[in-house]
Amino acid sequence: MSLITEHSIALNLTLPEKDVHKKMEVFYNPVMASHRNIAILLLNSIENKAMNIADPLAGSGIRSLRFLKELKKGKINHLFVNDMKENFPKTIKENLQRNKIKN
């Protein structure tokens, strides 16, 4: 396992030796970090809007964790997070605790 840091979030993940693939224990694609940065900038630029956000194929949950930590207060009304991997509930709970995010 490796401790990965992306902006304000730290994740403990097992990374593949080569390319990212769907058979990973928990999916995380570091190349998409810039897309997550843009999403946070965009959502923070929307004025006076409490949003309902869905992240149905969350993988490691990095996008949702960053939303919870980096979006301005009051931006999120509800955040729905899920993934098909069997160990996702355990993983997201551990990462919420690791990053001191109250669920």
State where each predicted segment sits.
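SAM-dependent transferase fold signal centered on methyltransferase-like domains
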Residues: M1-N103
